Amino acid sequence: MNGIPASRRASSIEYAIRDVVVPAMELEREGHDLIKLNIGDPLSYPGLPTPSHMVDAFKEALERQDNGYGPSYGIEDLREAIAKDEQTKGWDCRSDDVYVTHGVTEALQVLFAAFLEQGDTVLAPGPHYPPYMAYPQMYGAKTVEYALDSDQGWAIDTDDIRRKMNDSVKFIVIVNPNNPTGNVAKPSTIKEVLSIARDWPNCTV
C-alpha cells in the first residue's frame, strides 16, 4: 500500500520530543530495553499518583453527569479562581481576561494561530520546549532562539534579545520558571524585556 505523502509544511516541522519516537520503536522491536527521557510524564511513574482530592472531584463530576462540553472560554468558577491568583501577583486580572486551555501546548497553538503571519518571527529561549520551535513553522513563521546564560544559572540574556529584535518579531517568549533549565527570572529581568518590546510596536511578550 502506498503511503499518503505529507504536505511540505508538515515535512518541514521539527519537534524534538517526537522525532525520536519512530527510531525508539524500532529499537524496542529489536529487543532493546529503553529508558524514555524524551518527555516528562511524572504521573506515569510509581510513587507520583494523582492527588486523591483530584480523583474524588473527578468521580463526583462524573456522577453528576457534569462531563459535557464546557463553556468556550472555560468554566467561570475556574476563570475567577485563576484571575484571583493572578491578582496576588500584581496584575489587575478579571475573569474576562482568562481563557482556559488544555495545557500550554493548546495555548501556544491558539496564540500562534491567532497572531502569526507568513514571515513573522518568534524569539524564544534556547534551550526550550519544542512547541516553541514547531508551532510557528505551522503558520509560516520562524523561531529564533535568544541565549540563556549558563554561567548565571541560565538567566535570560537581555543583550542577546536586543541584538535579535527587528520588525518581523511578533512575540518574545518568556518561560518562567524555564523549561527545561528551571531558572526563575528576576522581576527586574522581566521588566527589562518588557522595556525592549515597547520599542517595537509589532511585538507582544
Annotate each predicted stretch with a short phrase:
Residues S150-V205:
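Active-site phosphate-binding strand-loop segment of PLP-dependent enzymes
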Residues R29, E63, Q87, L116, ...:
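Residue-level signal for alpha-helix termini/capping positions
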Residues Q137-V144:
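A short helix-loop-beta submotif of the ANL/AMP-binding
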